[in-house]
Swiss-Prot record:
Keyword ATP-binding: yes
Sequence positions that bind ATP: 15, 167-169, 235-238, 246, 252-253, 269, 273, 277
NCBIfam families: metK (TIGR01034)
One Gene Ontology molecular-function label: methionine adenosyltransferase activity
Record-listed Mg(2+) binding positions: 9
Cofactor note: Binds 2 divalent ions per subunit. The metal ions interact primarily with the substrate. Can utilize magnesium, manganese or cobalt (in vitro). Binds 1 potassium ion per subunit. The potassium ion interacts primarily with the substrate.
Subunit record text: Homotetramer.
Biological process, per Gene Ontology: one-carbon metabolic process; S-adenosylmethionine biosynthetic process
PROSITE patterns referenced in this protein's UniProt entry, alphabetically: ADOMET_SYNTHASE_1, ADOMET_SYNTHASE_2
UniProtKB keywords: ATP-binding, Cobalt, Cytoplasm, Magnesium, Metal-binding, Nucleotide-binding, One-carbon metabolism, Potassium, Transferase
Protein name: S-adenosylmethionine synthase 2
Amino acid sequence: MDTFLNTSESVNEGHPDKLCDQISDAVLDACLEQDPDSKVACETCSKTNMVMVFGEITTKANVDYEKIVRKTCRDIGFVSDDVGLDADNCKVLVQIEQQSPDIAQGVHGHLTKRPEDIGAGDQGHMFGYATDETPELMPLSHVLATKLGAKLTEVRKNGTCPWLRPDGKTQVTVEYYNDKGAMVPIRVHTVLISTQHDETVTNDEIAADLKEHVIKPIIPAKYLDEKTIFHLNPSGRFVIGGPHGDAGLTGRMIIIDTYGGWGAHGGGAFSGKDPTKVDRSGAYIVRQAAKSIVANGLARRCIVQVSYAIGVPDPLSVFVDSYGTGNIPDKEILKIVKETFDFRPGMIAINLDLKRGGNNRFLKTAAYGHFGRDDADFTWEVVKPLKWEKPQA
């Protein structure tokens, strides 16, 4: 059997870039909760003892940006300088202006346009991907890397591994078989975890705890064998982390946020953006389309692309590729997709309920992936029924 290796990585919520994603989305949540028509483009950067939020926000909401920054950092676990950032004593800088009136008139007519007439907030192309290799209809390498990161945070916060600190990264290499275009996982080839830790723990203790409390509960035993390679804190020391170790910036983890290197990516980040920004809403609707294609049995694996022009409601193009796994021709799948899904940004916002903030709705997306999550707030993960007739054998 001819197999190949493919690798996906993830970072957990204490990684400096992910910290920034979460702050940007916490700001978005706060704006949308009070004013669903908020126009938000919120960026965050962080370094030692400092967090800055900046961008363009037009909203009727009364938002305390500094309070949001400090709470988000505190909830992650950045409560002292020695873990990478002190949420209550760090400098918080705010540089927020209103959305450009040029963009406002072209996209939403200064809030006068009907939902179906709202134009895309910018040009761009977005991809949605789905594969039948996991129940989530997501790539196994990405699912495992993401879940390992989430587990690291869980055992840190519940005290199972008290030596853990907030920052950490994971990476999983899976051996696959290509079954006529569909991806079939055979085994896990390599597991890599690099996690921030305190001064008291030894490398042997780190390795033992990671295997017992993180890897064992997450990676199914059927994928592990005597040849599986484990790299557990291979650098030997990771005490300095968070924004103290590396500068952080919103939007630098776009592959981790999506499909772990599978499918494709148009380059636009998600966090801190309201649904008129098609980088986010466009990517969400094509994930729903791709997932629905696979869940309804039209294909075992597929990718869907959509593209936009600023100020124009209708997409410029929609594309479907089933990698040869389709039960009907791709052009017929495309026809079904176009008949079922409304790709206009204003309608995406309504159909996926993307103007609703609060309850950490978007903050939840900003760590451990935007796709493949079992959560009612992830409305784009709901499979839509697709009408098609299976060809006669």
